Amino acid sequence: MGSMGGSRHLKAINAPRYWPILRKEYRWVVKSSPGPHPISRSLPLLILVRDMLGYAKTGKEARRLIAEGYFKIDGRVRRDYKFPVGVMDVIEIVGVNKYYRVIPVPTKVLGLIEISREEASFKLCRIENKTTVKNGHIQLNLHDGRNVLIRVNDPRNPVEDTYDTLGVLKLSIPVQQILDYVPLKEGVIAIVSGGRNVGRVGKIVSIHKGMRRYRSIVTLEDKQGNKFQTSLDYIFPIGVEKPLIKLPEGAW
């Protein structure tokens, strides 16, 4: 007998701890559909609309608003209330000129910060890996599931490939034009996307490479001069001289 696949249902008690839901009031909670972010690092659009933005009091109200096309993610209307929303996604409330970015925050892991219309025109995406495709072109695979193709004139000397794994692209949305690039190196500003220091912002002081990425340790220094460490896997570069995105007051 073949496998029946994963369950389409999720008990509230088993949902990621950072989801802002009333676990004792409801037995079941909406489960994210397959999409650009894993369930461990995202939350369903319905929970964002109802529990974080407060545009609905019930799941039924949230589903209706989403189905009517009132919410854009990264410049595109999303009508699937289970659509997974994750780090650096840009949310637009259609018709009211409100824009938000999902960022890592202390304790809550994922939070929203209101941004300007100008800032809502771009997104930061971390390069997770690179692959060589037909004709020697380079494909950059990003943290939110999207891919960017770098066209190469001479595969034997790919001078166009100036991007490294774990660096960050500043992309226009929804058209995906590369506007800027932040490499992963000492001296750049980064935000921590997970672990006990989630949401902290600092300048990278040193990178100690291990046998695996999760064993590599990065030391950062915050604006107050306090040093802290985290896994390389949690490092998300956000700027060289200054952050490219708006951050909570006091973060940097």
Curated annotation (Swiss-Prot):
Residues 43-106 form the S4 RNA-binding domain. SUPFAM superfamilies: Alpha-L RNA-binding motif. SMART domains: S4. Keywords: Ribonucleoprotein, Ribosomal protein, RNA-binding, rRNA-binding. It holds the Pfam family S4. The keyword rRNA-binding applies. The keyword ATP-binding does not apply. GO terms for biological process: translation. InterPro entries: Rib_uL2_dom2, Ribosomal_eS4, Ribosomal_eS4_central_region, Ribosomal_eS4_central_sf, Ribosomal_eS4_KOW, Ribosomal_eS4_N, S4_RNA-bd, S4_RNA-bd_sf. GO terms for cellular component: cytosolic small ribosomal subunit. It comes from the Archaea. Belongs to the eukaryotic ribosomal protein eS4 family. This is Small ribosomal subunit protein eS4. It comes from Desulfurococcus amylolyticus (strain DSM 18924 / JCM 16383 / VKM B-2413 / 1221n) (Desulfurococcus kamchatkensis).
